[in-house]
Swiss-Prot record:
This is Solute carrier family 7 member 14. It is found in: Lysosome membrane. Disulfide bonds: none annotated. Changing residue 391 to L: In RP68; uncertain significance. The keyword Transport applies. One of its GO terms (cellular component) is intracellular membrane-bounded organelle. Residues 736-771 are annotated as: Disordered. It comes from Homo sapiens (Human). The chain crosses the membrane at residues 58-78, 83-103, 119-141, 187-207, 216-236, 251-271, 291-311, 336-356, 360-380, 384-404, 407-427, 565-585, 596-616, 628-648, 655-675. Expressed in skin fibroblasts. Imports 4-aminobutanoate (GABA) into lysosomes. May act as a GABA sensor that regulates mTORC2-dependent INS signaling and gluconeogenesis. The transport mechanism and substrate selectivity remain to be elucidated. One of its GO terms (molecular function) is amino acid transmembrane transporter activity. The modification Phosphoserine is found at residues 465, 468, 488, 757, 769. Keywords: Amino-acid transport, Glycoprotein, Lysosome, Membrane, Phosphoprotein, Retinitis pigmentosa, Transmembrane, Transmembrane helix, Transport.
Amino acid sequence: MSGFFTSLDPRRVQWGAAWYAMHSRILRTKPVESMLEGTGTTTAHGTKLAQVLTTVDLISLGVGSCVGTGMYVVSGLVAKEMAGPGVIVSFIIAAVASILSGVCYAEFGVRVPKTTGSAYTYSYVTVGEFVAFFIGWNLILEYLIGTAAGASALSSMFDSLANHTISRWMADSVGTLNGLGKGEESYPDLLALLIAVIVTIIVALGVKNSIGFNNVLNVLNLAVWVFIMIAGLFFINGKYWAEGQFLPHGWSGVLQGAATCFYAFIGFDIIATTGEEAKNPNTSIPYAITASLVICLTAYVSVSVILTLMVPYYTIDTESPLMEMFVAHGFYAAKFVVAIGSVAGLTVSLLGSLFPMPRVIYAMAGDGLLFRFLAHVSSYTETPVVACIVSGFLAALLALLVSLRDLIEMMSIGTLLAYTLVSVCVLLLRYQPESDIDGFVKFLSEEHTKKKEGILADCEKEACSPVSEGDEFSGPATNTCGAKNLPSLGDNEMLIGKSDKSTYNVNHPNYGTVDMTTGIEADESENIYLIKLKKLIGPHYYTMRIRLGLPGKMDRPTAATGHTVTICVLLLFILMFIFCSFIIFGSDYISEQSWWAILLVVLMVLLISTLVFVILQQPENPKKLPYMAPCLPFVPAFAMLVNIYLMLKLSTITWIRFAVWCFVGLLIYFGYGIWNSTLEISAREEALHQSTYQRYDVDDPFSVEEGFSYATEGESQEDWGGPTEDKGFYYQQMSDAKANGRTSSKAKSKSKHKQNSEALIANDELDYSPE
């Protein structure tokens, strides 16, 4: 027992080391270099995913995953119950909000193009392993539910065309399953099971086959859309948009409808999951995301216009609005034409949910966060066939046992969370130093920030030589660059915000003068009034930045500015969550104009604006990409606000189910993923490799130059780790080493350290290379 209590002695348990090890594991990031230029696309089984997708294929995937449910279901639902003919405005507002998240996805797709896994991979590269697993796990949930819901919706469509004979037969012959669905007549949906299995087989047969099937259905859906537009023009009536009829529920109904219409645009992230299978992802991904959102908006608005002009908004059928609007005018043949389009659109939406799900599973399994057998890629179909079969089976099981109403309620929370994290990642990456983009979470460490503060990222390259850490230097960290001498932090021009590129450009017309940037004669195109305005407000702006403690407006961010942005984004997320919660759950106090409620709202708005302003004043990373999200930091910040608001609008039962799913994911991650991660295995191999040379480490008190002696029988064993140590030796403490006249070389610079160790091994006749 004494040994047990001794092991629990806080002096013996290295709590700090244990916390640091866990902290470093959950925040470790995946190097971007491993996914660039096709690197890392080969699986453990030696098979690559086929790179066969064109820009048109990606647009077809994005449109198909969105337009089915949005055009045939959401338009009628929002028009009747929320916004009336104002559903048109609701779709436009939702489209703007979706485009904000879409441009962030597009930048990430360009930054890390050769990837599968979408937001999961992006988070793994930027935020860290734990957050990436959390996002990927919830993306699996959304695609799983979306597939099951699509199969159930198709089953309901066929049942409706058959006058509900299928559902009655199943309820009478098979029986009901009370408790699995909200309705008392919930029955095992065998037709939905069959549909899910068929689509799973199509996806598993190969990406080219599934994309071809998807394109055919999209063409069919397009033909039906054209038919609706032309046929509907003969039945429109402008009186349904008369005064007071366009916005029957006011702007509150329009905004409520916009929150629902936003879900009709969810699905464009499927484009980002196929980066590894695209022929030219750098240009295809941003173009396909933007084009698919614009096409979906056009389809939704045009259909909503025809729908609300053909029938009064309060008579719209919510289950099949486009079919019933022709029936109301006696055009029964059109019902079956629209039914064909509905089946095609819902099938494409089902395919859009099932297609990315195995690819997210494949990406996570390839990284070791899920079981690695799920990353197997078939050499025949060049698809992650095991992940396809497993995910399709789970989706079919859900479609069989759970009602459509219950499935729809769980569809959006994980996707909205993924959108929010992508916006956060864009904000963080654009303000991090170039050399630390792969692992910017290190900025959370104060010690790392102190080491890096004041050193520009590009000065870690060969053109620049930072002052050695071992040299005694009382001033701040500086650099010497052979190509370009950067101005000091005390330079007024840099603090005011002028670019050092223009200042040190030898081709500048006024190069060599005292002030190259203000020569009116040298640059006649520059406005004289703008120059005078800069001279007038420049000193005041400089003084304001100094008093506010803002950094110099340099072209290159530093570790300190990156750390500032990280903290600001974290606070921004928390404040937005509190703000949206109060707007939603405290709306009664705001509508009553309670002074404290209004004061609280104004205070939070000011705090959010201040954080955005602080982020705006930090220097951005100068790295140019083929596509970059515009108007930073406003676009990602507003996307975060919209996504958080929509997440909080979801029901309580959805959050409870979400919590249960997350708990299962945490068990998998901490029980398996964290210990079998590819990064964990690499770290173990690196530690094992370093231990091979540990005996000859020049940092050791027992250096190769001095040699070492073993303890004799007469000598005390205390200094060698105790009497139980029979073989080998343990390193003595540094204080003992110094007492014996040995000095550690840790005070030396890293470059000198490397040269000494190479020289020691080179001069030795023995071979110390690992076997």
